[in-house]
Structures are given as C-alpha cells and as structure tokens.
Amino acid sequence: MAKVLVAIRVNPEDIDVDLDKLVNEIKARMPEKFEVVRHEKVYIAFGLYALRLFIIMPEEYEGGTEDLEELLTSIEGVSSVDIEMVTRTEAF
C-alpha cells in the first residue's frame, strides 16, 4: 500500500519559540499512522528559523492534508504552516 510524503514548513510565532520542544510536541500529537520521519531548521531572516517537517501519512486518508494543517496550527507556538510538497511513495 502506498503512502504520501508531505513536506511542510511550520512557522513559529516568534524568535523565542524553542524549535526542539516544538518538534517533540508535534511528534507527540501526530495521529495514528502519521509519522514525522525527518525534520530540519530553515533560516528565514534576522535570527528567525522555521521547521521543515517530512511526514508520512496514509494515501487513502480522507481530507488530504487539511486535518494535518489544522492540528499543527492548533499547537502553541505555531503561527502558520505551508505545504511545500506532497508526493506518493512506497518507500515507507
């Protein structure tokens, strides 16, 4: 069964948000069958960094990435999210 790999940028509310804690909070709140397989910090400007997450989710998940976006924006410290890429994969 194929899965979907989503690259999503998570923008913090401000420069003081601890991105390591934010990643742990996001991983803890992922629904069943969703997995953060990789994350990295992305420099924005003036000392501000965002998170780029690579998340595996079921291909047949109803609603696509909408629920994932809502979940991420509901977490304290998250200002907004941007879907950067969605691709089908059988590698995971």
PLM ranges: what are they?
Residues 1-92:
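Long, contiguous binding/interaction regions
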